[in-house]
């Protein structure tokens, strides 16, 4: 029997590939080669699955990244910021999922609340890191917002900004803000 996480991972793959309308019980059971009984063993209908899917997205693509950066509590803000940038840049294929969740959030209230929570958590963490930088020519909160909007914009333009160009944008922004080469 597939685990709850197997169902959620399959849901994220479908969401990234084809958008929220593709995430149906029929598609999921077909993708996993399982019965609807297995699905209902883990979730109380479509609403329960979609709630769990949004929570899974948040856990994997926000909470997990922050927790990974915070594994070294003695690291200074600069080291943590660089580590976060490296983690974000390591998953360029994640952009399709980010785009799909944002598109879903435009049409669904629950997805919108989840996206707002994700954006708020991410920007609050970036603000915390930017406030801890030794020196910045840009106000810390503004720098945090700028770094986040670079990522969102890079994912949304067509074609999306390639990972190496996104890395260069981050490196230039951090160099302009701190006077140091961090990436």
Model-identified regions with their sequence ranges:
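Amphipathic alpha-helical packing segments from all-alpha helical-bundle domains
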Residues: 62, 83, 93-100, 109-135, ...
């Amino acid at each position: 029997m597939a685990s709850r996480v197997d169902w959620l991972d399959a849901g994220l793959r479908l969401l990234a590939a084809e958008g929220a309308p593709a995430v149906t019980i029929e598609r999921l059971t077909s993708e996993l080669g399982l019965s609807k009984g297995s699905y209902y063993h883990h979730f109380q209908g479509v609403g329960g699955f979609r709630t769990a899917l949004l929570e899974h997205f948040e856990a994997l693509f926000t909470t997990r990244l922050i927790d990974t950066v915070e594994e070294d509590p003695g690291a200074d803000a600069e080291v943590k910021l660089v580590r976060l940038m490296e983690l974000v840049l390591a998953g360029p294929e994640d952009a399709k999922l980010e785009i799909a969740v944002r598109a879903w959030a435009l049409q669904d209230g629950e997805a919108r609340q989840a996206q707002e929570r994700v954006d708020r958590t991410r920007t609050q963490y970036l603000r915390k890191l930017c406030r801890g930088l030794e020196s910045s020519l840009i106000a810390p909160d503004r720098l945090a917002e700028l770094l986040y909007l670079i990522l969102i914009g890079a994912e949304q333009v067509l074609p999306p900004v390639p990972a190496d160009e996104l890395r260069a944008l981050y490196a230039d922004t951090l160099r302009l803000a701190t006077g140091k080469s961090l990436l």
